[in-house]
């Protein structure tokens, strides 16, 4: 340990081994690598997500030759000892013996990455996030550059000691690894960072739609680079759209506060009748909450004045009207041109009643019904839809407190009417909990082992109190779709747990098994619907579309992780094919439209709602867009939909090739409509979908994809700016023309709102000034579990969603989301 180098014998000398500087893929193909992360070759050939470097390339000599090795200077040695550059983490404290073995974080090789479920996401994310937050003084000029060893440099005692400590930690880690594997052989344990993606305030699981968008690294790199390069035009458009959306949000917030003071106000009776009928024929026919005959009886008594109306019923009626008005898309029925403001006021009023102290009816079946209506209204009217998962936890606990999770057969004295109402309500509670957990990418709060409540009987509401004999399964009733959903609930819950679990990591055979069970359940539902007797009532288009959405979305989420790896591994080709076919099935909808029905009911919901009615379609659009791009760029195989899932969509080969492109362009047009008059101002998704279309067109013509993506982003932002200006002007004009609101007693109540204090239309055209600080990407850091802490430089209030994905810098996407007050701004 005197620091002098020990000369090696002549017989023990070996050839000088040059350090490995190229990435793994370029080194195997023996081509020149520019040593970037990712390198230009991997980025050009579509392997950016798997561009990795050999971490321990400079320590390949035997242990006995360690004192004679040439090393770098101490600063560079400490830089390369980072977990992203070496196999082990170097302890920073003096207590070397107290360094826990868990700090040793080996970087998996490419083979290990493909063999694991989400290791590619973990490796690239870990590499980029660590290099981003590393001290600039210890960062090489090039990210992929590893300094060469020079003969003039000699190892110091500290360097030799550090190397010895590394070897000891490796030995301790290798000795403890078999013990942990024997303790839990059925659970594949891994780094927690590999199981989830962390943002500033949100933890997204594998069922979130942003996971699929991680494949479009070209789009995100191009837009991020343009923002960071101070592109005046692009940044100015970005600022104007952002500030306009905030101004619209303030106007909606002002209106909601004013309308909330109008207690008991309702639209006209004619408008209420249309909205109530729309709700009963759509959502109430699939997600059973109310007993329709009883509800209509009290509703008619309210207008005639024969019986006093309770506050609880009025709250239910307001939410039913809000949902029905969204279905029929007639906002003028609610007495205001801005339906979102009135829906927000009604939702806030119902939530205040649910959380008010001293309300004994909260812990009752009526209270559970109101709670379900509140959550459904938030989803349909895009009011805090991304936070519904948090509220479903309280709903589930209230339902369990009432014993809805236990089958009514355990209570012999309970009437048949009450027993069936409880079964229907429990089915709806389970569905809301499961769907909201999938939207947010979090583990489901329910387990099939924790309840024994059976599905409801196949009875109509009119026969519920007169007979207990259910109808045959081929007779459509008001509970037929609830029975179908409850039948496939166990496999869907299992899929949701597999996707968003922290500890369990399923094998591909397990995914195939779950996919087979889920596909069989979907096919069973299809066969049951086809077997409905033609002499009785037939299912509506809304019922068919909603049933497909609630079931097929789990099949898409289940195969999505392996479909992303199918481009490099043929073993996952089946997942890629299933994802494409399921995505087309979700986007295209039911191939035939039943005659004599309201065909626009579901289209209006899909156009204006959020959460459940937006996220699955975004994931399906991203899946279809990536498949089209792969085929256009000359991928090694083409994945055409030919299975029974889409056989109704493609009768000829030429038509089959056009179906993915058609459904993708249709949804891009639908997202543009959401900007114009939707409750949620969703700028981010519209810009990203437009960039996907532009990248596909550029790949078809052979033009540069970066230029096409940037041009599409600018054009889409300009269109967003025009739309938002029109919306703001219409809001300003409507403030001067109050709309009459009718109380159920018959009086008119005028509503007039004052002007706001800020005129956002006078925005600086150059985007300079205070707006530049709104999206300073240099001040945002990443929180990845406990490894990084949010510093005071982070602007959490301005960044509604901070997402870090493998090999991507999502700082650009964080502010591309603006909603009306209470609408989702975190799941975009």
Swiss-Prot record:
Subcellular location: Nucleus
SMART domains noted in UniProt: Fungal_trans, GAL4
DNA-binding region, residues: 23-51
Pfam families associated with the record: Fungal_trans, Zn_clus
Keywords of this entry: DNA-binding, Metal-binding, Nucleus, Transcription, Transcription regulation, Zinc
Knocked-out gene: effects: Results in significantly reduced expression of the leporins biosynthesis gene cluster.
GO cellular component: nucleus
Disulphide bridges, residue numbers: none
InterPro entries found in the cross-reference section: Fungal_TF_Env_Response, Transcription_factor_dom_fun, Zn2-C6_fun-type_DNA-bd_sf, Zn2Cys6_DnaBD
Gene Ontology molecular function: any one: DNA-binding transcription activator activity, RNA polymerase II-specific
An individual GO BP term: DNA-templated transcription
Chain's role: Transcription factor involved in regulation of gene cluster 23 that mediates the biosynthesis of leporins.
Protein name as catalogued: Transcription factor lepE
């Amino acid at each position: 340990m005197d620091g002098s180098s020990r000369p090696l014998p002549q017989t023990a000398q070996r050839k000088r081994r040059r350090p490995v500087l190229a990435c793994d893929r370029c080194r195997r193909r023996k081509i020149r690598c520019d040593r970037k992360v990712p390198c230009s070759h991997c980025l050009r050939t579509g392997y950016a997500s798997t561009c990795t470097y050999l971490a321990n390339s400079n320590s390949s000599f035997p242990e006995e030759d360690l004192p004679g090795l040439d090393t770098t200077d101490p600063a560079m040695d400490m830089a390369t000892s980072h977990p992203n550059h070496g196999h082990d983490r170097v302890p920073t404290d003096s207590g070397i013996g107290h360094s826990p073995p868990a700090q040793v974080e080996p970087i998996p090789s490419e083979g290990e990455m493909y063999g694991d479920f989400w290791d590619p996401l973990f490796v690239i994310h870990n590499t980029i996030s660590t290099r981003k937050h590393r001290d600039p003084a210890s960062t090489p000029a090039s990210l992929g550059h590893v300094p060469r060893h020079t003969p003039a440099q000699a190892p110091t005692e500290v360097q030799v000691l550090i190397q010895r400590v590394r070897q000891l930690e490796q030995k301790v880690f290798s000795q403890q690894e078999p013990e942990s594997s024997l303790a839990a052989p059925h659970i594949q344990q891994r780094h927690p960072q590999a199981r989830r993606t962390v943002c500033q305030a949100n933890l997204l699981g594998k069922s979130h739609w942003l996971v699929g968008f991680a494949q479009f690294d070209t789009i995100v790199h191009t837009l991020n680079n343009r923002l960071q390069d101070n592109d005046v035009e692009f940044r100015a458009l970005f600022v104007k759209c952002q500030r306009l959306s905030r101004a619209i949000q303030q106007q909606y917030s002002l209106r909601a506060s004013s309308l909330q003071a109008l207690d008991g106000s309702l639209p006209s009776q004619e408008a209420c009748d249309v909205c109530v009928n729309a709700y009963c024929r759509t959502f109430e026919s699939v997600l059973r909450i109310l007993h329709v005959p009883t509800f209509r009886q009290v509703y008619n008594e309210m207008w005639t004045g024969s019986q006093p109306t309770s506050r609880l019923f009025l709250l239910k009626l307001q939410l039913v009207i809000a949902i029905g008005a969204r279905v029929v898309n007639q906002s003028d029925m609610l007495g205001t041109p801005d339906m979102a403001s009135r829906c927000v006021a009604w939702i806030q009023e119902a939530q205040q009643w649910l959380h008010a102290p001293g309300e004994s009816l909260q812990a009752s079946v009526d209270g559970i019904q109101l709670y379900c209506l509140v959550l459904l209204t938030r989803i349909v009217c895009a009011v805090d839809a991304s936070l519904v998962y948090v509220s479903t936890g309280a709903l589930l606990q209230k339902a369990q407190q009432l014993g809805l999770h236990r089958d009514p057969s355990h209570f012999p004295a309970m009437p048949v009417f009450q027993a069936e109402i409880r079964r229907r309500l429990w089915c709806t509670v389970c569905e809301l909990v499961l769907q909201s957990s999938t939207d947010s990418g979090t583990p489901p709060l329910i387990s099939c082992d924790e309840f024994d409540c059976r599905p409801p009987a196949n009875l109509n509401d009119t026969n519920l109190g007169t007979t207990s004999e259910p109808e045959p399964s081929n007779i459509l009733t008001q509970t037929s779709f609830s029975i179908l959903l409850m039948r496939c609930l166990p496999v869907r819950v299992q899929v949701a747990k597999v996707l968003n679990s922290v500890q369990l990591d399923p094998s591909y055979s397990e995914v195939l098994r779950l996919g087979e069970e889920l596909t069989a359940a979907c096919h069973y539902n299809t066969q049951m619907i086809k077997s409905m007797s033609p002499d009785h009532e037939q299912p509506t288009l809304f019922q068919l579309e909603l049933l497909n959405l609630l079931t097929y979305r789990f099949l898409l989420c289940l195969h999505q992780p392996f479909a992303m790896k199918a481009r490099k591994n043929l073993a996952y080709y089946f997942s890629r094919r299933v994802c494409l076919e399921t995505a087309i099935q979700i986007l295209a909808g039911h191939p035939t439209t039943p005659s004599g029905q309201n065909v626009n009911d579901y289209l209006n919901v899909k156009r204006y709602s959020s959460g459940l009615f937006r996220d699955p379609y975004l994931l399906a659009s991203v899946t279809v867009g990536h498949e089209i791009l792969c085929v256009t760029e000359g991928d090694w195989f083409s994945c055409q939909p030919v299975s029974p899932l889409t056989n109704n969509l493609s009768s000829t080969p030429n038509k089959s090739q056009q179906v993915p492109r058609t459904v993708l362009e249709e949804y891009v047009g639908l997202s543009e409509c959401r900007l114009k008059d939707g409750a949620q101002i969703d700028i981010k998704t519209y810009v990203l979908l437009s960039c996907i279309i532009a990248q596909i067109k550029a790949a078809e013509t052979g033009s540069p994809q970066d230029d096409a993506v940037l041009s599409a982003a600018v054009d889409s932002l300009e269109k967003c700016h025009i739309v938002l200006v029109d919306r703001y002007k219409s809001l300003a004009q409507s403030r001067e023309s109050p709309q009459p609101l009718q109380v159920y007693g018959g009086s008119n109540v005028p509503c007039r709102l004052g002007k706001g204090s800020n005129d956002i239309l006078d925005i600086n055209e150059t985007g300079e000034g205070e707006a530049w600080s709104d999206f300073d990407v240099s001040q945002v850091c990443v929180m990845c579990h406990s490894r990084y802490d949010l510093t005071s430089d982070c602007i959490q209030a301005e960044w509604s969603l901070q997402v870090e994905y493998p090999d991507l810098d999502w700082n650009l996407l964080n502010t591309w989301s603006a909603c009306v007050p209470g609408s989702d701004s975190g799941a975009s």
